[in-house]
Structures are given as structure tokens and as C-alpha cells.
A protein has these predicted regions:
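Helical "lid/coupling" subdomains associated with nucleotide-phosphate turnover
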Residues: 42, 59, 79-103, 107, ...
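Short glycine/serine/threonine-rich phosphate/pyrophosphate-binding segments
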Residues: 52, 76, 153-157, 176-184, ...
Length: 368
């Protein structure tokens, strides 16, 4: 997804298509605090292996309304798989982006108690990850917390729950990051989806692209090698093998939440500029995903860089993301994939708003 460090995108409030043809709720449906003009602002900051993203929102009746957003590709994990450390230039890029995030938070008047700032795989893996987090705290005032893969996956699932087709028996949520990919299997029990299993594969778009540099020739062989690499990483899924039958028979579907799938969606739709209201909630078939990946491969690096939904910063990563999605679709062959331009940040916002609704212990004691 292209960076957006200008004015906030107005289409964050748009409503994605549901499986029944109706529109889904604004923002991300779920728990929320007080709504209306006087509602407080909440912030969610996600520093990943590839991107630095910020959302600022206020609660609404059916979720939340985004009032400001920021996204910049920083490639914090560049070279990490080779050295085990965050590179100086990569840290500087991330630091500059975080400075801008801090300025936006201050400008909007978001209270520090209502800002959740997290770091994921790159800082988890790097031996100097904690030192970088401390540098950010001292220099920007932002207190980032390195979260583990379990919490990262849980938040991503929460952020896209209202994109689940309520008529199916199972859903697989795939969150493709820069340094890892989280997979979450949920099954329908009554009116709710319950987590059946989870895994974090240490393969993301940055790590896969670094392992498999794009060659001058034999692009098909290169792409298949990336698919096989990811396939090996997810071969041992921590769920009952019988669950796969639900995907084969059309009683389950996949939700993809990342730039990997939104990029494929933009190519599939032929967008001349990225439009979240057309991408978020879109249904794609497996054939649609494969055709979009083939289009990207035939474009070449220069052609991909010129695509408005890809851009030069993602031109060398987007096919790694497509290969990851294809590996998942081969292992869990759902005919339908739902595109989610939402995930971890939205989960962070919903978690805060849910906590704000809970009565304090003092108030509970006063009523007893």
C-alpha cells in the first residue's frame, strides 16, 4: 500500500462490501467507547519490519472514525536476516518516520494514555532491537512496546473480524509482514468464531525477497522457489488436518490482511490510484490472485515501480508477498479470499476503546 503522509485519507470511513452484497460497518466494527463530537481521540502506532503506520481515531456508534493516518515504508528489517542486527540506515529511516508520527499525535492532542505504540518482528528478532526502542523513547517521547507473535496475531484478527462471512464454518486470517507471516485458523461455534490454532512463520516479504533476489531470466522458476520456501515454512500447521476439508469444499475462506493482498487487489481492479473503499472488503478468487501475480511478474521491476498501487518502494517486494499468499492458498485451497486493508492498528484501537468502556474497580466497589 502506498505511503500516505499527507492529509488523512477520507475513505477510511468507507464501508466494505459484505458477502451478501450489503455494506459493512464503518471503520472496524466492535466495541467502542463514547461516541460523538466529544469522544476522545485514540492512537495506534505499528512499527513493523517494512512499514511504520499510525491511525488516530475516535469512537463511533458502529466502530470508529479515522481522523488522521500515516504510513511510510521504512524497511527497518533490511539486512536483518543476514546480520541479526538492525542496520544504522534502516534505524534512521524508521526514527524519522516515528518523529513525524509523534508530531501528528501531539498536533491532534492524543493523550499518551490513549496511544498504543507497538513494534513487531524486526525489533523482536534484532539483538539491538531494545536499544533502538530506547533511542526512540529518548528522542521522540514515543514508548513503543515490542509485542510477541501471539499478541500480534490476536490484534490483527480483532481488526478484521467484521469481514468474516458469517455463513461459513471456518476462516483463515493471513497477516503477511515484512519479517514474518501470522496464520490464524478460526471455526464457527454458535454465533462466534473461535480460534482453533495459530502459527507464526519466520518468512515475510523482506526476508523472502532477500533470500530470492529477482533474476534476469526464468522468472517462473524464481517465483516457484519463493512459493516453495513459504510452503515449507507452513507445512506443519497446528490444527486438525480435517479442517482443510472445509476449505476444499467451499465451507471456509481466507482473509488476507497486509500490503501483499491489497497490492494484488489494486492490480486486479486496474486502479490508477489506490482506493481503500474499493479494496477493503473485496472478494477475490484464487484465479484472480494468480492472474494479478502473473501481471506483476510480466511487468518487470520498472513496470511495477510505475504502478500507482505498488510504487518504487514496493516494486521488489510485492511478488514475494504474492508468493506467500499463493503458498497459503495451495496449502489451504479456498476458492475465495477476502481483502482486508485493516489489521493490527485497528485491533489496537478496538482494544483500547473496549477497555475504556469497562467500569473502573472503584466504581464497581461503590455499587457493591
Amino acid at each position: 500500500m502506498p505511503e500516505t503522509d499527507g492529509a488523512p485519507r477520507r475513505d477510511h470511513r468507507s464501508q466494505p462490501r459484505r458477502s451478501d452484497g450489503k455494506r459493512a460497518a464503518n471503520g472496524a466494527a466492535g466495541d467502542h467507547g463514547a461516541s460523538g463530537r466529544d469522544a476522545p481521540l485514540y492512537g495506534a502506532l505499528d512499527l513493523g519490519t517494512n512499514n511504520c503506520r499510525l491511525l488516530i481515531a475516535k469512537p463511533s456508534r458502529d466502530g470508529f472514525r479515522v481522523v488522521d493516518s500515516f504510513s511510510r515504508i521504512v524497511r527497518l528489517g533490511e539486512g536483518l536476516s543476514r546480520t541479526g542486527r538492525l542496520d544504522d540506515a534502516a534505524m534512521d529511516r524508521a526514527y524519522e518516520a516515528l518523529l513525524l508520527c509523534g508530531e501528528r499525535v501531539a498536533k491532534r492532542g492524543v493523550d499518551s494514555s490513549r496511544l498504543m505504540a507497538v513494534a513487531t518482528q524486526a525489533c523482536r528478532q534484532a539483538e539491538n532491537g531494545e536499544a533502538f526502542i530506547e533511542r526512540v523513547r529518548l528522542g521522540t517521547g514515543l514508548k513503543l512496546r515490542i509485542i510477541d507473535p501471539v499478541e500480534e496475531a490476536r490484534l490483527a484478527v480483532r481488526g478484521c473480524l467484521n469481514l468474516f462471512d458469517q455463513s461459513v464454518e471456518a476462516v483463515l486470517v493471513v497477516d503477511v509482514g515484512g519479517g514474518s507471516t501470522e496464520l490464524n485458523w478460526l471455526t464457527k461455534r454458535g454465533d462466534a468464531f473461535v480460534l482453533e490454532g495459530w502459527m507464526s512463520a519466520p518468512v515475510g516479504v523482506v526476508t523472502l525477497a532477500e533470500r530470492h533476489p529477482e533474476p534476469a531470466g526464468d522468472l517462473d522458476g524464481w517465483y516457484e522457489a519463493m512459493v516453495a520456501d513459504m510452503g515449507a515454512a507452513i507445512a506443519e500447521a497446528p490444527v486438525n488436518p480435517a479442517l482443510r476439508d472445509l476449505f476444499v469444499s467451499g465451507r471456509a475462506h481466507i482473509v488476507g490482511t497486509s500490503g501483499a493482498i491489497t497490492s494484488l487487489a489494486g492490480i486486479h481492479l486496474g486502479l490508477r490510484r489506490y482506493q481503500r473503499n474499493l479494496v477493503d472488503g473485496l472478494w477475490m478468487t484464487r484465479a484472480d490472485c494468480e492472474a494479478a501475480a502473473d501481471t506483476l511478474m510480466r511487468l518487470g521491476a520498472a513496470g511495477r515501480a510505475a504502478e500507482p498501487c505498488i510504487g518504487p518502494d514496493r516494486a521488489d517486494l510485492v511478488l514475494a508477498g504474492a508468493a506467500i499468499m499463493e503458498a497459503v492458498q495451495r496449502a489451504w485451497p479456498s476458492e475465495r479470499v477476502r481483502v482486508a486493508d485493516r489489521g493490527l492498528r485497528e485491533g489496537l484501537l478496538l482494544q483500547q476503546m473496549r477497555e475504556a468502556r469497562k467500569p473502573s474497580r472503584r466504581r464497581r466497589r461503590g455499587r457493591s
